[in-house]
Design a protein with these regions (language model features):
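Metalloprotease/metallohydrolase-associated module, dominated by Zn2+-dependent proteases
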Residues: 1-70, 87-135
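Active-site recognition of the HExxH zinc-binding catalytic motif
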Residues: 74-87
Length: 135
């Protein structure tokens, strides 16, 4: 999809979706960055960074990675679920400060953190989809 198509979907859906997820008090900025690759060489659909103390987030979407509207909406929800889980970012940032230097302990904790966060987001997505069918 091109940037304008993805932007149109996001502009239409983000506010109602944030309200449904209980995060409409957050300020979420969205940008569109094509062809971003993750550490494993896979094309990224989206990414979310959060400033939990300020209820502020930035979502970056890769328009070229989407084939259709359901794909855009799934990724948008996924990134917004990271905002829902943002209070746990305090734990992550505290551990980062406590472990000044890189090393095996930090690598293990980073791995556990990433896995736990992504699994929690996937579970929220499943919950959301099942609740939507009940509406």
């Amino acid at each position: 999809m091109d940037r304008s198509q993805v932007k149109e979907i996001v502009d239409r859906e983000i506010e109602p979706l944030m309200k449904r997820l209980g995060i409409d008090h957050w300020k979420v900025m969205v940008s569109y960055d094509p062809e971003r690759i993750d550490g494993d060489g896979q094309i990224k659909h989206g990414e979310c960074t959060r400033l939990v103390d300020y209820n502020s987030a930035h979502i970056s979407l890769n328009p070229e990675s989407f084939e259709d509207e359901p794909g855009v909406l799934k990724t948008l929800r996924h990134e917004l679920f990271h905002v829902v889980l943002s209070p746990f970012d305090l734990y992550s940032s505290t551990v980062d400060r406590a472990l000044d230097s890189p090393g095996p302990v930090r690598e293990i904790l980073d791995r556990v953190w990433t896995h736990s966060c992504e699994k929690a987001v996937i579970n929220l997505e499943r919950m959301f989809v099942n609740m939507s069918y009940a509406d």
